[in-house]
Amino acid sequence: TEPTLLKSVGSVTTHFNFEAYANLSRQWGKHDLNTTFMYSMDKIKSKGRNTGRAFMDVIGQAHYAYNNRYLVDLSLSGSASSILDPDDRWGIFPAIGAGWILSEESFLKNDWLNFLKLRASYGVSGRADYAVNLFQDIYGSGGSYFFKNAPTSMSGMKLTQLGVEGLTYEKSHKLNVGVDFKAWNKLSLAVDAFYDHRTDILVAGGNAVSGILGMSVPNVNDGVVDNKGIEIALNWDDKISNFTYHLGGQFSFVRNKIINQNEEY
């Protein structure tokens, strides 16, 4: 018998990651300032496959406290992803937070109150965990075609995927207010109320393109969803003689509302 020749095409994937950060802290009088700057790069490449992707993040954070009572946090990040449309690869995401530790105020100093803090924050974040090459038009084998009076057909190319126009980050605009409370060195309570407004969610494109085209309609960043709710955590920690025990419970209520998912009317 004649030998059978087998040919296997392998793939080598390389993953390169680089991170760097710098931290600067300063204290003067009743002031406390801490700043952090971070840079990260992540690159993944597979030899022989068009699935390579790269990500970059530049982040700056600052925390300021006055007299251990009044707190302010600022954050600004810039993110880039090769998965996105070349004109929309960079996203800017700011955030701000503030807190007030009331238990440090003289008018609330007492033996039974251990800790009481009011806090609020607002920030924008983005995610882009999409498939590679969604923004590109892709061509593939188009089957057999006859040219003029030729008796045999010939293979050709056709458009198999319409790229997502303006593919960008899905964004989350989140507002949170809360209170942290601890008393008698035993009881602790945390209450959070939040509102999350998500925009640019990738959803089906609907009937934006006629079915005569012969391919699936590309998705679009048109989805909008609102989430709001409240979360409560209550804990009790105590000790009786040599016996230590913990009791705790959590309650959460969340309401979700779809504002837009590019539905057909």
Language model segments and positions:
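Extracellular/periplasmic, surface-exposed regions of secreted and cell-surface proteins
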Residues: 1-265
